Amino acid sequence: MQDDLDGIVRHRRRSLSFLQIVTLTMAGLVAFDPAQVLAGHPTTDSELQTAGSPRPPGLEHCVDQEERRVARRLLYISTLDGRLSALDIAKSGKLRWSVPTGPGPLISSSIHRLELTNNGQFVRMIPSLSGGIYKFDGDSIDPIPITAEHLLSSSAKFSDDLVISGGKETRSYGVSVRTGQLLYECSLNGCVNSTEEGLAIDDTIREPDEEDQLEDGEQLRDEAGYIVRHDPLLDDVIIVRRQTQTVRAVESRTGVERWNFSVGQHELDLVRPSECQLQPRDELELAVLDVDIKVVVPEGIICAFSKSEPQTMLWKYKFDHPIVSAWNTNADDELQPIDLFSSAQWLWDQDENDTELPNAPQSPPSIYLGMYDKQLYIQESIRLRQEIMDQTKVYQQLTGDTSLMPRIPWKPISASSKSLVIFRKDQEDPEMIAEGAVAQGGELVPYDDENFAVAAQSVLNASEFVNGNGFYFYTTGDLNGPQECSTQNNPTDLPAITAPTSPTNATSEGTEATGNHSVNDDLGFSLDDIDAPVKVVILSLWFWWKEIVVIAFTSAVILNIFMGQRNQRVEREYLVIERHVPVQTAIEATEASTQALLGPVVPMQRPGNRFSFPPGQANQRTISESTTHSGEHYTSRFQSDFELMQCLGRGGFGVVFEAKNKLDENRYAIKRITLPNKESSRQRVLREARTLASCEHHNIVRYFHSWTETPPTGWQEEEDRKLLAHELSTSIQIETPDDSTMPSLTEQLKEKRQQQLLSWVSDAANSTACSHDFHLPGESSLKNIREEYDYDEEEDSLIEFRSESQSAALRAEEEDDTDDDYEEDEEQQGDHEKRHRSSVSIDIHSASFDLKNINYSQHQLVSNSFQIESVRPKSSGSDDANDDNKARRKPLTLALAQNHNNNQNGSQPTPSSATILNGTVAKPSKVYLYIQMQLCRKESLRDWLRDNRSETRAAHIGDIFHQIVDAVDYVHLKGLIHRDLKPSNIFFSQDGQIKIGDFGLVTDMADIPNLVAKCGDQSGLPSCARHTQQVGTHLYMSPEQLLGQHYDYKVDIYSLGLIFFELHVYFSTEMERIKTLRSLRDGQYPKDFAVNYPQQYDLLQQMLSAQPEQRPQTKQLKSQLRNILQLPHLLSEGQSEQAELAERARRLSRSRTFSSSSEPHQ
């Protein structure tokens, strides 16, 4: 028994010894790290430090699924837009997941636009992502010993009118490494857990396909096909810490923000299950350790290379935003950051055997300067950031020399792949990192001094040249340090880093480095001036003594030359005056003053179209002055740049031509307007060009260009005669009788119908004679005026004050009426002889003649003169008197001298200057304004209404009126009033689109006074045109305009109502149109209109209301028209705007039936 027990004991002892040996062997295998042997690289200091640290106890091999250990092969990337992304290194860099972080991008700044001035040199402020501030003056980038924390805590350093606000915010995120699910988010407001059922990742079952079969290892799924949810006990978690620093500077009085910047950075930490620590790596995970990651920061490119074969690129991935940071796991399953600045050396380390490449620098760059979304920012290396923090502490204590702050000269190295070296798998297969980039010979793209200056100026001005690009920089210590130790490892051998320096520069740099610097010298500007956008630092006024002397001397010389030329011009003006002529001045324009001024009016007796004075005036002296300018060498820009095609007629205040540009061969509408000499009147005429230039709407005539011309006197008139000879038929006399070739009065009466010049030839303003009665065709304008003012046959005289254009227009109307009633006048000659009137027209220059008690300041004159016409009734005394009055029916025109003196007592007149040569008046040269506009069809909306009946218009009324209202709405939104809306001012473009033109009467709403005089008051001018507020076509003017009351933009609504009515009603004759519209203004609608158009009738009641406040606005009008006329809505799906315009043009073309195809009018 004893022997059996002893045998059992010995057996147990052997078993325990064997178990102990096995345990020791296993412990040795576990302590030995096979990854270092398989990876084939020596152990680094960080790995030794990590290996020496104690590991927490845990279970071995607790997780068998490969996807649970996916953190070992992921690459974490932080981009500038604030997102954190994960790339699978083993899956050719495929994007595993990407999560955003708040509150937004890592950079949001306006401080880079803050321009400070240091002794006349601009200084640009650039923030860094770590919270620091740098200043750049074009020569160097210098750190400022101020951070965001200092700005928020030390407000006493700034001026009293600046308040600093902001803060530092930290947000933490928990992200599942395997699924990319956002587990929680913690901020100042608390933590939000996203693992509830409603916020969990959306797991759906999809039909298995080839893509799913290829990505079986992409996500861990259960038997039912669902993605396995995050397990906090088994899955790894990435802790993302987002630190954001925000600083805002605002004015203490107004609260206006001067500048701001907000920067942020990401910090990552990997949390693994505490029970699963000692897990072996498989072959795929061991291969991941052999991958070297390189980064192209500005382009967001990640490149993976093999450590064993550095020239072989495994894969590449490109982000849409620049890269800020990158992390991966090491052999100890711990996160380690990737040095982005080592990528600058990596480019030159790829091909060390190439003799053409210079030696690469041995130290990484210090900072990176980039631009993102037009915002400059800086990233520092860890070494430089620590050095700046140490020097900042010294600066705050004021115990050290501030010159020890690191200085970074402007010697950039491009960080873009467009200047990288070619990487080759073999000698015949070049491959670039950036697609589309081209390299030659495998060499670096060097920077020279010119490229340095261009890049520096672009950064200083924050231009688009550097937007999306980036540069690396070295500090002065990095550039100078290797020269003292070893010249072979000098990084300045690279052409992209150094530039040749002269011995003088070297000496000055050495002096600067060893000299003493103050705080302001180190900063380059005072801290009190950082709040100002632009400030100039001037130590003394004597600093600019050279500039002051040059400016004073130059100003004296220019002033002396200008005054000398002005005196010479004045002398030349007086030298042309040869003689004086006595002229009687008038206080009031009456018949007595006219006779005293001119003497008895007698018919001309001298043949040959010359003036004949009475014998009593034979002793009067005559003067002669040559003021004519030769037009032989004058060149008109209109004639040199354009080829005249035809005259389109009158528009606004001038003549409209169709002309083809000789350069682009396109046809345009050119409007020519004569500018008045009076400055206020000239500005009102220029208003049309300025209004067209400021309007950009598809239903308003397009404006291209404008210019002015000042031809010699008589040159433009001669060109107009040539034009008329070409345009008009030979049956019409086109020659304009002037003052020197005036025919006899008897011949004028016989040839009155043939000696007409079309009103649109002269560039005078439209006739705006005031009359509440509209002149109908066939009625005499002279009869209307006589009836309006209740003229009596026994009245002695009538004196009318009109501009030249008004007199010309009135005479043209009289002549037209005389032609129509010629036969009737012959039958009733006895009656008409009693009413024959003789008139004397006196052309007085408004610039030099003054009539008291007459206010002409508000009269808008296109010409610089007006006429006094003395109209006397005909007496039936004798035949001689009848003949005399017949002869005086055509007015004589005499030009009085300029600069008359008032003679109230009627004594001997004082001599004045005159410019008369051979009986003609020498007028000053006219200034013409040319406006180049879009060429529309010659037919206007008035022609379209005349040639299309109501049934033909029905399909187009809504489309046409909608475009008109849309254009008027745009004009009102710009604060303007058209004031002359009528069918003749609405045109069609070449593609049939509505175009509103003729902005000659447009005005600003703010320019209208609260009170205007009524039309035809007692101020001396019976014309509505005396006020710019009382203009436009009378038939379409609102009641408040006609009554001279205050008005606003509602006058255009009234005109739109009349146009809207015309679109629905067809008029067979012009007489019917005018009578119907005049009745409509009085509230009388045509019979059956309210029955046929009930909705239109209700709308017109509002638009034509006598009370402006009852008229709708354009927005309300468009809303009502949409329901009434069924206006076109948005374009149908798949139909382009061009197709819609083409269809509209075809519809309008089919509806237009002009004279060749229209029905005969009744």
Curated annotation (Swiss-Prot):
Residues 1151-1162 have a biased composition (Low complexity). It is a single-pass type I membrane protein. It is found in: Endoplasmic reticulum membrane. Residues 498-517, 801-839, 1135-1162 are annotated as: Disordered. Residues 813-828 have a biased composition (Acidic residues). It catalyses: L-seryl-[protein] + ATP = O-phospho-L-seryl-[protein] + ADP + H(+); L-threonyl-[protein] + ATP = O-phospho-L-threonyl-[protein] + ADP + H(+). Residues 642-1130 form the Protein kinase domain. The lumenal domain senses perturbations in protein folding in the ER, probably through reversible interaction with HSPA5/BIP. Forms dimers with HSPA5/BIP in resting cells. Oligomerizes in ER-stressed cells. This is Eukaryotic translation initiation factor 2-alpha kinase. It comes from Drosophila melanogaster (Fruit fly).
